[in-house]
Each structure stands twice: as structure tokens, then as C-alpha cells.
Regions:
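Conserved catalytic breakage-reunion loop centered on the nucleophilic residue
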Residues: 1-180
Length: 180
């Protein structure tokens, strides 16, 4: 959920913003997803856990590995703490926040994180293209845990589902001639 905020700037203009608001059930679910993934190191096992425990999305659907990965990689859940600051700096993220704002309490807001094109699936941009600020919302996942999960996901990238590669395809062919 989000809450509308407005303030008056020095030059008298009204600045409007949105503040993310916590929804207790969703916060608990996000914590569970991170916890299970950190324990198992597997998107499939996390998916299986959520299925067995009847955890569903806010639209009432079953989670997919893709959706779980989306939650695990979304920095909005990360607490803006020392570890988060170091990680973002090391990854050359464009920070629009002072070091002091990484107070161990608030969450991260990341902009320009995805490339969205009509008719195409959204793509995650390289971190160097992100624009990151400290939000007004409370963070949920400690920076160290979020960073650890990113490292675990990087290790698992080679196992990620893409298009199946079959050894049979090059051997099969269609012949329209009647030659024998």
C-alpha cells in the first residue's frame, strides 16, 4: 500500500511523493521467502515450501520461481544500513542519498531498475544504471541478508531455466522426397 505525501519546497512549489506503507501479512511473507531461500539456496525448494504452506500472491495465485526471484532481487525490501551502502557503492550504483541516511531503519527505493518495452518482457538493467535513494518506508530485510541472497542467486544463475536444449533436434529431419 502507498500513502500520498506532499510538501512545499523552498521556492513555494508543492512536491508530491508516495510513501510505501507496510502490510503486515505481506511483510511476513517476504521475510518467509527470504528465510526459506537462505536456508535452502533454491528457488524450486522455496516455491515448493510456499506451495505446501498454501502461501499465495496478493492476487490469490500460486508463486512461480520467476515471482520469487523478483521478490528476492527487489531492493525495496532491503534495509538501508552500512552493508547496503557498501554493496551499492561497490556496484557503482548512482546513489541519491547521503551516507548518514543509511540509518538501518528505512528501505531502499530503486529507479530505472527495469527496461520496459511494449510487447516485451521487462528486463532488469545492470546495477550501474540504477538510481537509488533511501525511502521513507521501513526496510524489511537486513542489508547483509539481502546481499547474501544476491550472491546465492548469482551462483545459481547457471541453473536458471531457459529454453531446453535437446540433443535430438539436430538428428531429426523432415524429408519430402521419396528417395530410399
Amino acid at each position: 500500500a502507498s500513502e500520498s505525501l506532499s510538501s512545499v519546497t523552498v521556492d513555494g512549489k508543492v512536491k508530491k511523493a508516495c510513501k510505501l506503507g507496510p502490510i503486515p501479512e505481506e511483510i511476513q511473507l517476504v521475510k518467509t521467502i527470504f528465510s526459506v531461500f537462505m536456508e535452502t539456496g533454491s528457488l524450486s525448494k522455496t516455491d515448493q515450501y510456499l506451495l505446501e504452506h498454501r502461501c499465495v500472491t496478493k492476487r490469490g495465485k500460486q508463486f512461480t520461481r520467476f515471482a520469487i526471484r523478483g521478490i528476492l532481487t527487489n531492493p525495496v525490501y532491503m534495509i538501508a544500513d552500512d552493508t547496503a551502502y557498501q554493496y551499492l557503492k561497490e556496484n557503482n550504483v548512482d546513489l541519491f542519498a547521503e551516507r548518514a541516511e543509511f540509518d538501518g531503519e528505512h528501505g531502499i527505493m530503486a529507479y530505472n531498475r527495469t527496461l520496459q518495452r511494449p510487447g516485451k518482457a521487462n528486463q532488469i538493467r545492470p546495477m550501474e544504471e540504477w538510481i537509488v535513494a533511501v525511502g521513507k518506508h521501513p526496510g524489511i530485510i537486513a542489508g547483509g541478508d539481502w546481499v547474501r541472497v544476491q550472491a546465492m542467486l548469482d551462483v545459481n544463475k547457471s541453473k536458471s531455466y531457459r529454453r531446453p536444449r535437446s540433443n535430438v533436434a539436430p538428428l531429426s529431419h523432415c524429408s519430402s522426397s521419396n528417395s530410399t
